[in-house]
């Protein structure tokens, strides 16, 4: 398959390889979503992919699926709709998927992230070492979304601690 060849070649020549998946398309089933999640974990294990992200489908204006969902009256175009397009709240559990609930999609997204990052770090323990070695450096540069989120959390803790000590 050309996709796997591209991933394999990019990783072999030293490129940073990151995969992004969208789950929960209107026609998808639970099995379809699980296939995407396990494919991401497989690529992390087999080829050394550095980052695997999962997003839940949302219908974008002008797209074929948007028009289809609008025609079927499965989405309402109002201010709230556009507000939700620009900001994704992980606690929101809405789904356009006919076969999977919003709560299940949120769980699958979390499961996908968890499985992928566990695979990314356990399959190549040097990444754990490099992360901790570089984390407290002034010029820390995260190699994936997980590291960025940990770093953001750390910075917020430091700022809150500093703010509380001033008060």
Stretches found by the model and what they are:
Residues 104-167:
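Membrane-proximal basic amphipathic "stem/tether" segments
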Residues 1-127:
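A structural motif corresponding to the C-terminal lobe/cap of the Radical SAM core domain
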């Amino acid at each position: 398959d050309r996709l796997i060849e591209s991933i394999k070649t990019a990783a072999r020549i030293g490129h940073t390889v990151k995969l992004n998946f969208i789950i929960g398309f209107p026609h998808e089933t639970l099995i379809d979503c699980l296939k995407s999640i396990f494919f991401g974990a497989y690529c992390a294990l087999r080829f050394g992919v550095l980052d695997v992200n999962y997003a839940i489908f949302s219908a974008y204006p002008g797209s074929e699926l948007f028009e289809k969902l609008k025609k079927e009256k499965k989405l309402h175009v109002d201010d709230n709709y556009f507000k939700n397009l620009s900001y994704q709240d992980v606690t929101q559990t809405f789904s356009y998927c006919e076969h999977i609930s919003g709560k299940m999609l949120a769980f699958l997204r979390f499961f996908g992230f968890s499985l992928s990052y566990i695979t990314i770090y356990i399959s190549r323990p040097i990444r754990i070492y490099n992360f901790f070695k570089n984390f407290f450096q002034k010029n820390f540069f995260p190699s994936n979304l997980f590291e960025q989120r940990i770093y953001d959390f750390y910075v917020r803790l430091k700022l809150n601690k500093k703010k509380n000590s001033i008060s």
